[in-house]
Amino acid sequence: MIVLPAIDILDGKPVRLYQGDYGQSKCVAEDVLACAKKFEKEKANYLHVVDLNGAKEGSRINADLICEVVKTCQLPVEVGGGIRTMEAIDFYIENGVSRVILGTSAIQDDCLLKDAIKKYGSKIAVGLDCKDGYVCTSGWLEKSKEYYLDFAKRMEKIGVKTLICTDISKDGTLQGPNFEMLEALKNHVSCNLIASGGVRDLSHIQKCKDLGLYGVIAGKAIYEKTLDLKEALNIC
């Protein structure tokens, strides 16, 4: 299992949100590049980077900074947030991003998703972000009418290989991921599953590993030092 430290970017700064609430953002460091270099030094497997402004606005707001992270670090980087056109997907892949995460566009634009998978295959992942069991869009601000298991099965049928799975109510809480949701997903689809949201400590990392997940994302736990990234990597 891989462990992906998270860098969420809002107005050019690394921040953490609480339950996806932009009004409850907290700056966790002064410099995005310094965060990325620190995670590289600690031998992270992968970086998970989100353009929060982009997710809200539907465009590449922090793209230049993200590209700088990709060029500066020797780690594979996955990027999400506001990627809703093939031009945006092309831009990130051409600038060295290893995996592009589609969220809103995966729900609203089947044609784009299918074309992206045809062109880039496993370099395309989908963010399964849900609240009360239903998938959310537009930076988690809007709830759809699609149940998360139905969405996951639809994504698998289209050819999606990797799902980043977040229960929004768990995000930033340090209360643990929604293991019931993750287990249900594991039982219903064969996609690679990455858990996100709520991770606090090594016990949560171990439980994700025991479930047979492909990966787990940790953000607030690392910044608030309830989880040591090196120790997490060691047990995986």
Ranges and model annotations:
Residues L112-K119, K209, L213-A218, I222-C236:
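C-terminal helical cap(s) of enzyme catalytic domains, especially alpha/beta-barrels
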Residues G12-V15, Q19-G23, D90, V97-D171:
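Conserved anion-binding
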Residues R60-C67, L141-D150, Q175-A184:
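Charged helix-capping and loop-helix junction motifs
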Residues C73, V77-G96, E180-L182, K186-G215:
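Catalytic cores of alpha/beta
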Residues H48-D51, E78, I101-L102, A125, ...:
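Conserved beta-strand positions in the central sheet of alpha/beta enzyme cores
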Residues N53, I61-K118:
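Glycine/small-residue-rich loop that forms an oxyanion/phosphate-binding "nest" at active or ligand-binding sites
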Residues D8, F39, L47, Y92, ...:
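Conserved, mostly hydrophobic/aromatic
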Residues Y46-N62, T104, I164-Q175:
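Glycine-rich, proline-tolerant flexible connector loops at the mouths of alpha/beta enzymes
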